[in-house]
Structures are given as C-alpha cells and as structure tokens.
C-alpha cells in the first residue's frame, strides 16, 4: 500500500481521513412534502406549507427517497435495516424554519458497508483498498442564505429546504489525499450508476465534509477538524493537504489542534475557523413524534435489489475477463456512466459493422473511445459538433481501419471531417483520397526504386544493421505520400531484403 506521510520538523506524521458525503436524492419531490426539487427555480418558488413549517403541517415520507437510499446501500454491500426511525436535530438558523432538522441519528436506514478503491500508480495508490462505510442515513436539507442581494440584509431561499439527502459516512480508513479523491470519485460513480444522485458537485447535489487528523504512525487518533461543504474532488484533496500540514505545524510549534468546524476558501487553498465543533448532545436529538418508524417489507427490498444495474466493479471485471481489456482501460471505461454507455454503444455498432464478436474488436474500440476520439474532439474545440459523431459513423471508420483501408492518421482526418460537417465516412475517404494503397505492384515499384538508390544501406542491413529496416519503411511511406499500407510495405521489404 502506498505510504503518504507529512514530513515535519520532528519526524513523520500520518494523516487520518474520514468523509461525510451529502448526496441529494434523485426524486421529483422533497423528503416530506410534494414540492418540486428542480434546480435553478426562482427563489422560494418551490416551498410547500410543510417546508415552511406552517402550524399543523405534518411530514409524510416520500417512498421514492427511501427506495433510492436503500438501493444505494445495496450497491455498497451494506446492511439494510428493516426498522429505522427519524430523529429531530435541534438548532436555530435562519434557513431552517422548523427550528430542527429531521435526520436519523440512532437508527439509520442503512448500516455498515464498504467501497473498493482500485490501485492507480499514477495517483499514488499502489494497491486496491477497501474503505469501510459506517452508515447511510436520510435527512432534510436546509435552505440557503443569500448575502449578495442587499447591502444590509440577507435573504432566505427555501427552495432547497426539505430536499432529501443521503449522508454517507465513511470510516476513518483513508490515509492520503489520493485515497480520498479516489473514494469520492468511486462513490459518485456508484450513485450515478444506481441513479440515486446525479453527483453534480458544482450544483451542490453532492458535497463532502472532510474530517482530518494527524498522528505519529501507529499511535492513537489525534484531534480532528471538519471542513464543511467541499464541492469538488480537487478541493477535497486540497483541504486534506492544507489541514494536515497546518495541524503538524501547530503541534510541532507547541500548540494543540482544536476540535472545530472549518470552511475552505478555494481562492487561497486554505481553511479557516467557522465554529467550535458540536457533539451530538449539543443538538438534543430525540425521536420525531410526527413520524412513525420505517418498517421495510421483504417485497420492497426484493424490488429494490432487482432494480440495481451492473455496478462499476462487476462491469470492470467483465470487461477484463470477457472482453480481454487491460485493467487500465477497464477502469477508465467504467469510471463514469456516460463513458461506459458510449463505449458499449460503439462496441455493439463496430462488432456489427465488422461482422465479428465484441471481444475481437473490444481493444480497438476501447483505444478509440479513450484516446483517439477525445483527442480529436479536444483539438477541434468549438468546431467539433459531437452530435455528428454517431456510433454508426465511428463504427464505419473503425471498420475501414480494421480492413486496412485507412491508417490511424487517416482515421483521425476522416473523424475530424465527420465532426465538422457530418457525412458518410466511406464517402469522405473516397472523395478526399484518404485511403491506404494496398496495391502490391505500386508499392513494390516504389520499394525497388528506393533499394536501387540506396545499395550501400542495403549491404549494411544485410551485414546485420537491422535498424535500417525502419529507414526503408520511412522512405517507402514518403514515396507513397503516407498512403501505403504499412503491413504490405513491411512484408514486401522483408521478402526483398531477406
């Protein structure tokens, strides 16, 4: 396992990291009301009487929110508690009309689970590692204070108030920023696969509270700080890096780390004190008297389990075992829902176009999907109209390349034209002269002329200077304006040079 350490003035320090990820549940309505959850509405346009805590309004649990949380728990191999209960978390803040948040402290919906992060040498993770997940509980989100609408007043937008959140609490099992980043990316992928959260950190539908402490290797856990509402993977890693170094500097200078809540400033890459960290007793939790306990029937659990898709780990293993892809390609292709969906669509189209089974074309399609196509799209910038790059058109390009009709470079040129203008790839190849020459007569004539003009190099090659073979290939390709089929060129040269 990779070993990440902070090098302090007095020796090495180990970082201990736990994450509490708040994921907005994919649902058309809020957790306890029928108000819409659509993002971007006018302030206070999506607030029911329940959300506004009007007297006499009683909460009614949204079955879909519970279903999505259960499916998420199943996706991380967690214990699903068939009996759970809602509690009131009491505190006063302007964006919380009830004066309490409905959450689950004592009896959460989902118990212990786990999540696997894969080895990634580039990221500094040398081995696969299992991260424990302590629990998932369901709770209400709060509203939002708006401080930039008036010079002397703050406004309250309650559109978000009452939206269902899953709080996914990890064990303090991570030991580096890289592991934490990998954990958040993997968790986001699972949520997107399942469809229980869109994982959009920019819009706030997924955010992390980052708990960091430091200790000497092998010692007890140190005092932790919690940095709230971090909304990108990169920022999560920056928070850990900064906090760990800040705590080490503080301890080594004779100070002590205080248990506190902090805020992250993306502009400076630093954290600052927000308030002292509260404990559970500070919130005076007690069971919500307006809500009955949740009791889940076996038929409901069976329905949830049956609705789960193939998950990232299973898909990655299938890509390696059944399609013969490398571990790297399998991991990259399964990292995001959109990536694997595009790959599988293109794989099916290419196998059909070429007339082979998917395994035989999988590596070619994977390399195209991960490297070639994104590179061309990026190079074109605004000129690329990705809607032109249908799976059928890309499959037609790959079919010509597989048949030796076009080279890799010509495939890129044809794809550029498709992105800019659309059109049939085979027609483009014919009209633009973007096809390889496989005519042995024409290639042989060019090679004969090159060998005749380089008799000294021919002799050197025959005397053991094998590297000159590349020279002859290059000269032939130059003479054929880069359009000669490399396989045909190689074979004719081997036959003639002996």
UniProtKB/Swiss-Prot annotation:
Protein name, UniProt field: Aspartyl/glutamyl-tRNA(Asn/Gln) amidotransferase subunit B
Native source species: Erythrobacter litoralis (strain HTCC2594)
Signal peptide: none
Catalytic activity as recorded in UniProt: L-glutamyl-tRNA(Gln) + L-glutamine + ATP + H2O = L-glutaminyl-tRNA(Gln) + L-glutamate + ADP + phosphate + H(+); L-aspartyl-tRNA(Asn) + L-glutamine + ATP + H2O = L-asparaginyl-tRNA(Asn) + L-glutamate + ADP + phosphate + 2 H(+)
UniProt record similarity statement: Belongs to the GatB/GatE family. GatB subfamily.
The protein's Enzyme Commission number: 6.3.5.-
Xref: PANTHER family: GLUTAMYL-TRNA GLN AMIDOTRANSFERASE SUBUNIT B MITOCHONDRIAL AND PROKARYOTIC PET112-RELATED, GLUTAMYL-TRNA(GLN) AMIDOTRANSFERASE SUBUNIT B, MITOCHONDRIAL
The UniProt record lists the keyword Nucleotide-binding: yes
Residue ranges crossing the lipid bilayer per the database entry: none
SMART domains: GatB_Yqey
Enzyme class: ligase
């Amino acid at each position: 396992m990779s070993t990440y350490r902070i090098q302090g003035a007095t020796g090495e320090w180990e970082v201990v990291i736990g994450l509490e990820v708040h994921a907005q549940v994919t649902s058309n309505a809020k957790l306890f009301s029928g108000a819409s959850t659509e993002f971007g509405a006018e302030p206070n346009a999506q607030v029911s009487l329940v959300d506004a805590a009007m007297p006499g309004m009683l909460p009614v649990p949204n079955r879909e929110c519970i279903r999505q949380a259960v499916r998420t728990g199943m996706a991380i191999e967690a214990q699903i508690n068939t009996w759970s209960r809602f509690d009131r978390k009491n505190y006063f803040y302007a964006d919380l009309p009830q004066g309490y948040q409905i959450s689950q402290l004592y009896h959460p919906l989902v118990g212990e689970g786990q999540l696997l992060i894969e080895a990634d040498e580039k990221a500094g993770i040398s081995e696969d590692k299992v991260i424990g997940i302590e629990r998932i509980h369901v709770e209400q989100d709060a509203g939002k204070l708006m401080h930039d609408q008036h010079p002397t007043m703050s406004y309250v937008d309650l559109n978000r108030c009452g939206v269902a959140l899953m709080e996914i609490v990890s064990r303090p099992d991570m030991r580096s920023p890289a592991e934490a980043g990998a954990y958040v990316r993997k968790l986001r992928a699972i949520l997107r696969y399942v469809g229980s959260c869109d994982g959009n950190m920019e819009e706030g539908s997924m955010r992390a509270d980052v708990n960091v402490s430091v200790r000497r290797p092998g010692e007890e856990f140190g005092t932790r700080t919690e940095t709230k509402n971090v909304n990108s993977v990169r920022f999560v890693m920056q928070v850990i890096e900064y906090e760990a170094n800040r705590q080490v500097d503080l301890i080594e200078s004779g100070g002590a780390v205080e248990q506190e809540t902090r805020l992250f400033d993306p502009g400076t890459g630093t954290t600052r004190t927000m308030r002292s960290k509260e404990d559970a007793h500070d919130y005076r939790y007690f069971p919500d008297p307006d809500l009955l306990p949740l009791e889940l029937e076996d038929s409901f659990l069976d329905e949830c389990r049956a609705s789960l898709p193939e998950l990232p780990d299973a898909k990655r293993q299938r890509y390696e075992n059944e399609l013969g892809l490398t571990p790297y390609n399998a991991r990259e292709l399964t990292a995001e829902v959109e990536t694997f969906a595009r790959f599988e669509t293109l794989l099916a189209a290419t196998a059909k176009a070429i007339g082979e089974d998917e395994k035989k074309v999988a590596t070619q399609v994977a390399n195209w999907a991960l490297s070639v196509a994104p590179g061309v799209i990026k190079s074109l910038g605004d000129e690329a109209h990705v809607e032109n790059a249908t799976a059928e058109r890309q499959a037609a390009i790959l079919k010509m390349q597989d048949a030796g009709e076009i080279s890799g470079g010509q495939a890129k040129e044809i794809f550029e034209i498709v992105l800019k203008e659309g059109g049939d790839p085979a027609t483009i190849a014919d009209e633009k002269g973007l096809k390889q020459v496989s005519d042995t007569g024409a290639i042989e004539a060019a090679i004969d002329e090159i060998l005749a003009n380089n008799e000294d190099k021919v002799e050197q090659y025959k005397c053991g200077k094998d590297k000159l073979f590349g020279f002859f290939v290059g000269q032939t390709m130059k003479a054929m304006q880069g359009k000669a089929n490399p396989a045909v060129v190689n074979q004719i040269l081997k036959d003639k040079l002996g």
